[in-house]
Amino acid sequence: MPARPAIALAALLLCSGLAGAQDASFGQRLYRDKADCQFCHGVNGDGRGDPRSPGKAPDLHRTRLDREQLIEVIACGRPGSEMPHFDKYAYDAKDCYGLSAEELGKNIPPDPHSTSLNKREISALADFILATFVGK
């Protein structure tokens, strides 16, 4: 392989590794700070959150949710539970579980106690949870 393509390939591989590390760091900051998932799910994702959290959160190591399902749960919350929805537009239409806010009534997931997340942040958070906790 000529030197220039080899250098370009090495640079590409290095950058992709850095991007992965940056994505993981971004997801970790969302988990621990912005979304404050650790408040309920615990720093280690084991469901041992703060005693002041609204309820027992699932152990993320044991979840069977795939990426798309995890994204939906983060965006839409869990109807009838304390799991908040982090997409501020979650129930404006029928984007969550095919249901509207009116149809859910009192079972609508609560607003997040911290802040809402955009689609990029929701995806990064799901990727962090999958890479860090699920099945480990």
For each predicted feature, which ranges?
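C-terminal capping alpha-helices of c-type cytochrome domains
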Residues: 92-136
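N-terminal signal peptide c-region/cleavage motif recognized by signal peptidases
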Residues: 15-16
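Boundary at the C-terminal end of the N-terminal hydrophobic targeting segment
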Residues: 19-21
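Gly/Gly-Pro-rich "capping" loops immediately C-terminal to redox-active cysteine motifs
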Residues: 45-103
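Extracytoplasmic/secreted proteins, especially bacterial periplasmic and envelope-associated proteins
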Residues: 26, 65, 69, 120-124, ...
